[in-house]
């Protein structure tokens, strides 16, 4: 299980009006791909959506017992921005460890529009690969993408999606990213009032989504978001493994 956007499948200031999104592969995108060109962004790096707040300096730590060992993910909101498709986005660093060894280091880009929707605009990815003795042998960048570009040379242009809607309602279905053949994560809102209990005994009332992608048709994930905190848990449907929030700072 890979946790990110954040937990994806193994997430200048001033008034900005977005220009047209380039066509994807010469065809139209599905209806579930949000219309980025119709959004406006007055303060895009001020991300205060209650289910996906990004306050600079906040760090979330998640853990999961997996078949491969202990997985730990550290998510940090950086005091950095990046311009994507003419919009400034907030940079979120996500580091994933397996048995205390760094296996992935990403920088995700998010922006909030004037309606309160949080957009996912892409990510830089460093994947760390080791030999059986634990020696680093290569760093790859599989999974990297940027809205408005074709970074993998696939002949298509990536489009941004919603990582969290402003007013989510059960049944809402939307793409979180749309880069044909490379990144096509989708989500559907299942419920707004699901109570979950973490291993440490903490209870949260959560927004629940079911995440999926046609690139991995046999996999479904449930994610749970608490107001004022963000993501608190993720699980693969049919698996006993669950990624859980263990700390949030400050």
For the regions a protein language model found, what residue spans apply to each?
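Bacterial N-terminal signal peptides that target proteins for export
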Residues: 1-8
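C-terminal motif of bacterial Sec signal peptides marking the signal peptidase cleavage site
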Residues: 17-19
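Sec-dependent N-terminal signal peptides of Gram-positive bacterial secreted proteins and lipoproteins
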Residues: 12-15
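Conserved functional acidic sites
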Residues: 21-250
